[in-house]
Every structure is written in structure tokens, then in C-alpha cells.
Amino acid sequence: MRLKKLKSSIHKRLNQRYIYDCNKNINFANFKNGSIIVANDTTIVTVLALKTYLEDKYITVLGAFDDRAKGLEKVMGRIGIKYIDHISFWDHQGVLLVNKNLTSQVEQSENRFILFICGPEMPYFSQRRNLDRQIYFDIAKLENLRCLNEEMENLSVKTWEGYLNELKAPAEIWFRQMLNAKNNLVLTDTTGVVLDGYKFVTGAVLMSKKLQEITQQEDNVGVCLPTSGGGYLAILALMMSAKAIVNLNYTASEEALRHSINNAGIKTIITSKAFVEKLTHKGFFVEEVFSMCKIVYLEDIRAKITKSEGIKTFLEIKILPASWLVKKYLKPTKLDDVSFIIFSSGSEAVPKGIVIKNKNLLANVYQSTNVIECKENDSVAGILPIFHAFGLTISLVSLFQGGYIACHPDPTDAKGVANLIRKNKNTVLCATPTFLRIYTKNKSVNKEDFATLRLIITGAEKLSREVRTMFEDKFDKVINEGYGTTELSPVAAVNRPTKSPNKIGTVGLTVPGGQFKIIHPESHEELPVGVEGMIIYRGVNKMDYYLNDLKKTNEVMIQKYGHTWYITGDKGKIDGEGYLTVVDRYSRFAKVAGEMVSLGLLEQKVYDALREKGYDSNKIDFEVLAVATSDTKRGEIISLLYTLEVLEPSDLKEIVRHSGIENLYKPTNYFKVISIPKLGSGKTDFSKAKKLTNELVKA
């Protein structure tokens, strides 16, 4: 009886009822202040979609906001979205979005009702709910998602731009997080370093003081250190000193390193005697390669710190307020200041200096945190080198969020990595497919070693079907593939671990604050859903420019739709749900007799042909690599490098000839090699592979 009276009262106030279905246009002008929307989906996607229609109205979300929105209250507030736990906290302004499970809180409210259903449950709600207005708008339907997708992404980028402007500098965020950690563990490494929050900050402050004296007149400082306690202390110390950090790739050629040093104008390089000794055993002579620079050793810095100075600093860290410590020890920096200069791998050409500003670094750390859902009790296995953008960002995700990181300097040391994860009970592992392949093949690494891992993310190179199958069969762990480039700081897309399905064969959905498009590589016209073309990207994590290379910067940037986009150089497509598939790099296509041939696809076809003959790469450790070289008659020819010891080139040629592989794809040359050239990051060194192939062809 009470509900009938309530409904009658509402009718008198509204004069009419509005009933819509998904086949009619919804007039969103009818959403007046005080309207209530009940939905069976109140995720961040739905809320942002609603905001594109209700741009001028405030949206309050009552409960059940999904986990992806946690920590983003400030971001949402900037664009007029907030969420509450109970109806009593609503100020009756704008529109209230209510999760279906909390409808009882609003059923007897005297506000205008609108029923907003996001799925097939509409009839159920229509029959049992006493609501005045009913709308069936199926946002989950593909056609509706496509319409909303672009506006949502535009809103997302705009929102994140505003969010970043409110953040403190990376050094201060990291510094404060370590202070908040207090006596809790934040970092360990395999050399025996164990640091809690107070010790980490103390070490960084003491090191920062000494480094400021040494590098007083320098803007860019080189770092040649492994993934270790010393490496991360040096990074924070230099951040506190407002220096741009250049993590040097000690696995690169001497020529590439000298180019990087000269381009960045580096005068001082921070390293350690223990690490130099290890590099010397591997044939890398630091003092020769870095002869043009002043080399500063961590051991010498440590020796200059007196015991009394250490105790005094430690007590200050424990006693003084964070705001005082920040003012005393951190040099002020702006979001537009340079944070890192990361040189590209040089896998295809001379290394480029990618300028990562504070805003780019922060954006990608928080974007990554949002999509991989890093938790406070997570511990990251830090195995990727700090000169690797992927390794650096993922490590900072942990350190910025209050988790801890366990470091091992050599990602190719399968047993060492396994021991690290087992000992520290790590929950997150980020590695390239090459490293995952090594762990799978190593018989001394077993399922129990990786038992504590809840999340495994791979990127930097394409994840092959073989590596995925082998790894998941051996360790019973799912791999989440992602995508990015150093120019994007670097994470741009990833298959979410929980909230969205892990769509095998794709690299997932774009990170929040970013947007992909597929364009024709020549005309630059946007291509429809599902059509392959050039991948371009814009977002808050996109670099502004290459160091001292305006020409190259202009080559990779394009003005489109009123924004600046980065041309990735990768061929791919986006499906109707927004998942990105990367086919290959455009540079990994050969032009044979006027036709474009994907070298990556050829490699997969060869693996398949060999498997049919009993040479299964899941069981036998070997690799194949297709390389295109110039040819006067055909434009380019394809040569196949392979490491299968038991097979002669003539035998492999016969297998390919009878395999059904199209003639256009069949290699001209077959070369058995000891190993495929690799970079320190685990990626294939295409530059060296091409050089090797040219030498073999000439021979």
C-alpha cells in the first residue's frame, strides 16, 4: 500500500512516464537533477560511458564501483563523478547511479526513478521493481560499445591529463611512500641487501648528498648498475637531486654506448666495483668503454659517509615530519622536467634517446598499477634490467604502491630467478617471452618454484604460441600478454588479469589515459574495425620528442583529429571489443617480387612444418629467424637462420618445400647457426642478425 501511494505521488509530480527501449533514441535531457539510475553494471566503463551523455551533470555512484576505480577518486572527481557507500550521503544533485544489488536503498525514495539496464536482465527488473521511469539501453551490445568507445577514450585521456597535474613529482611520491613503509620490507636482492622503508630513504638521502657534490653542474647523469638495491638507491638519489637519469645498456655494443653517452652529454657515470668486475669477466671493460667520462663507484661513496652522519640522518628520517624532510632533501622539479633518457635497444638502427618526462613516468606507473591491479601485499620479482623501460616501470609500480621488490641481476639465470621467487614468495613476474622460454626449457626449474606467482605479464616482443603453451603446461600459470614501446614509457596495452578476459593472440586493451587507432600506412586514413594497418597511439604516457633529433621526432609523430599521435611502426588491428592484435613490425616485412611477406608469419609456418616432422620446439630447444636482405633481381630475398643442430640446411629446405608453405614465403637460403643474436633485454638483435646473414650470403 505504501509503495502504491509513493508511486501515485511521483506520478503527480512528473505528469508522465517515460518508457524507452534499446531501439529508440534516448533523450538524455530527461535526466533531471535527482534522477536515479539503477544498473546491473556500475563498472568504471559504464560510468564513463554515462558521463559522455550526461557531460554537464554530476554523477554519484552508490556502491559496487569496481576495483579498477580504486585510488582514482580524485581523477573521477575532476570530471564530476564521485561514489558513496550509502544513500544518506547523496546530496540529491545530478544523477545517482545505483548498483542493482543496492536497489532497496532507493526504492522508497521520493526522487524520480529511471531504470537503466546494461544487459539481458531487463524483464526481470521491470517486473519486480516499483520504478517510475524505465530505460533499456544495452551498453554491453557491440554496436553501442563501438559508438561509445571513442568518446570514452577521449574522456579518459582528458581525465588523466587533469589527474597528472595534481600529482607531486616522482621523487617526492617515492620518497614519501618509503617513509610510509617505515620498518616494513621494501627491497631485497641476491647480494644480501635487505632494506626497509627507513633504511631505503636513509641510503638515498646520504647518496644524494654525495652525488650532488660530484654532479653539481650536470643535467644528465649516467648509471651503469644491475637490477639491485644499489641500482634503485642510485636512481632515487639522482631523482632527489633533480637529475635526468640515463640508465646505460651494458649489453649493447661499444659503438652504441659511446653514441648514447655523446648524445646525452654524459660526464659522470655511476657504477660499482663489484659490478665492473663481473662485466670484466664477460669481456666488457668499463674503464675503456667509458674512458671519456668520470666514473663514480658506489663503494667509494659509501666509504665517504661517516658513522655519525649515517646515524644522524637515520634519526632525522624516523623523527621529522615528511613535509620537512621533503623540503630539506629534495630539489624541486616540475612535471614537465626530464626524468629519464632511455636509449632504444638498437635492434634495428642506431639507438635513439627517448626523453621520458616526470609526467610520462608517473602516468605509466599509475596506468600500469590500474590495469594490473597491483596490491599492497604484492611482491615483484625484479629481474629485467633497469636500462629496460618495461623493467624500470614495473619495478616503480611496486615501490610507488607500498609493495616490495626482490631483485636478481641476470634474467637469463633460470635457476637464480627460480630461487629468488621461491625464497621471497613473489607474486608478480614481468619478463620477455625469451626469458619465459628459458625458464620453461630449464629442467632444474619446476612448477613449485613459481607456485606463489599470481600474475605473469610479458611484453617487449611477440609471445609465440609455442612459448605460451610450454610455459602454461609446465607451471600451470596464465601469461598475460601486453604491448608497448619505450616511446610510450612503455606500457600501452595489456590483457587484464581479472576484470576482462585474457584474449589469447591479442595484447589486450589500451591502458586508461591512452587511445589506439589503426590507419593506412601511406594515406593515413583511419581503417575500420578488424582491418590491419599501422598502429598509432596518443596518451599521457607518450614521449614528446627524441633527444637532439627533431627530424626523427617529426617522422614518428602525426597530427590527426586535433591531437598528436605516435606512429609505432607496428602493423595490427583492433577488434569490436577494443582488443589490439599486433601482426608484426612493418620493418619485419620483406618485399619479394613486389609482394609483402611477413617474416614473423613465415617463422610460425616453419615451426609448424618442423613439428609435423617430429621437431617440436616445445620439446627440443631451437629457434628460427627469417631475415630479409637486398637482392638486385627480386628486390629482397629471405634467408632462414636456425639453431636445430641435428638438421642440415638441405634437409630443412626439403621439409619446407613439401610443407605447403606458399612459394612466395619460401626462403632462398638456409643457414644453421650456433645461436640467434640477442640483446640484453632478451629481444632478438635484428641488426646483428641482418649483418650475420649478409656475411653468410656473401660467403
Language-model segments: which ranges?
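Gly/Ser/Thr-rich phosphate-binding loop
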Residues: L298, G310-I319, N426-A431, T440-N502, ...
